[in-house]
């Protein structure tokens, strides 16, 4: 078997994010590819007799060997999704996720192994819970999954980082890692030709064509229905099972079920379809306005502000097409908040007990009502709504 060695070195102070690959290409020679991550490699050839010497030299210079974490995925395909609109939806979301990965990482999904994902999650959890927010942990993360960075320092935290900056970095890396993991889980295997990707994921997505149901969806959206393009009913078996088990265990009733909105960028939507809205049990419990939870909105307008739709107020979207989730959630005794205080950043499931959700009312602290859930079993997917700008719907793209 041909020898391969893959090494990474990050030097933030010099804005250097370097890689060094050694690849045996014959019985007597090996090829070296080296350079800045994300740039075209500089290539040279050497006799195989100097392999060990060169390898040790690079390790002594501070390069980290990432070879064992690499995995090679075989090239297979999934069975085609029959419904045209559903196939188009999944294709678009895969493309959006793939583009985000390509613009942020210098490794492809096929070069990432489950071990790399697990190790990356461990590093991110260490960083999230480290009170000093040591940048060396971020450097380890960037070395494990090499990133495209024009200026490494831009991706690290300044010495005087505020809590919002810290949370933004954690959210950024969490979103990217979930995207990478979802794309990796979408790679077909040997028996994939017998299944669609949706079947592999225990996921059912069907277009909503019933006029009564469509009217109900639009009415619930209020003035935001102007952006409505189409809707799909989503059934994620894993999340649905967790939801109904929680529902039965806690003796909820039909009137305790609510349908609220959740908005996210296009690049995150495939991961949400696959995983649902899930909470990391190892994540820090502070940093968000009402603690670490699942944030939902009774009004579509608020959640649309977090989508990729052109003009979205919170993430400054630029896309003519975006997606909004309708989540089915259950609670019956919310903790009502009318005025926010800084101590609410550390709210948790146990701290609001015996209440089972936070309902933050619009007023002095918020423009719109907000609902926060601290147990992801209380939430499952109901619809994904396709949004389009009014100009696009009128054919003025």
Q: Which residues does each predicted region cover?
A:
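Segments that shape or occlude catalytic/ligand-binding pockets
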Residues: 13, 40, 44, 50-60, ...
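Intrinsically disordered, low-complexity terminal and linker regions
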Residues: 1-31, 36-45, 49-268, 373-397
């Amino acid at each position: 078997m041909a020898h391969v060695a893959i090494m990474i070195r990050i030097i933030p102070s010099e804005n250097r994010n370097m890689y060094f690959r050694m690849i045996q290409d014959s019985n007597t020679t090996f090829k070296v590819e080296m350079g800045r991550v994300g740039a075209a490699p500089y290539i040279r050839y050497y006799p195989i007799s100097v392999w060990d010497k060169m390898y040790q030299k690079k390790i002594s210079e501070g390069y980290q060997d990432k070879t064992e974490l690499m995995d090679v995925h075989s090239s297979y395909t999934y069975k085609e999704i029959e419904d045209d609109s559903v196939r188009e939806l999944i294709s678009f979301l895969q493309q959006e996720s793939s583009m985000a990965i390509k613009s942020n990482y210098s490794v492809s999904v096929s070069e990432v192994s489950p071990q790399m994902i697990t190790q990356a999650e461990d590093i991110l959890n260490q960083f999230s819970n480290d009170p000093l927010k040591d940048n060396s942990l971020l450097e380890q993360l960037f070395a494990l999954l090499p990133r495209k960075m024009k200026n490494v320092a831009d991706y690290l935290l300044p010495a005087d980082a505020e809590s919002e900056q810290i949370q933004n970095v954690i959210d950024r890396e969490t979103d990217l890692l979930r995207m990478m993991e979802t794309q990796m889980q979408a790679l077909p295997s040997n028996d994939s030709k017998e299944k669609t990707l949706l079947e592999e994921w225990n996921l059912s997505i069907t277009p909503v064509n019933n006029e009564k149901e469509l009217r109900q969806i639009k009415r619930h959206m209020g003035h935001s229905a102007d952006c409505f393009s189409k809707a799909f009913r989503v059934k994620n078996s894993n999340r649905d099972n967790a939801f109904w088990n929680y529902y039965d265990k806690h003796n909820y009733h039909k009137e305790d079920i609510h349908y609220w909105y959740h908005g996210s960028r296009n690049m995150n939507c495939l991961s949400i379809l696959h995983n649902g809205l899930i909470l990391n049990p190892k994540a820090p419990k502070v940093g968000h306005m009402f603690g670490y939870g699942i944030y939902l909105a009774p009004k579509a307008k608020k959640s649309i502000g977090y989508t990729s739709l052109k003009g979205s107020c919170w993430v400054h979207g630029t896309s003519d097409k975006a997606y909004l989730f309708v989540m089915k959630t259950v609670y019956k005794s919310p903790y009502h908040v009318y005025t926010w205080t800084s101590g609410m950043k550390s709210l948790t499931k146990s701290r609001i007990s015996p209440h089972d959700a936070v309902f933050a009312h619009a007023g002095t602290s918020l423009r719109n009502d907000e609902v926060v859930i601290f147990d992801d079993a209380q939430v499952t997917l109901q619809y994904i709504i396709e949004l389009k700008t009014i100009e696009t719907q009128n054919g003025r793209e």
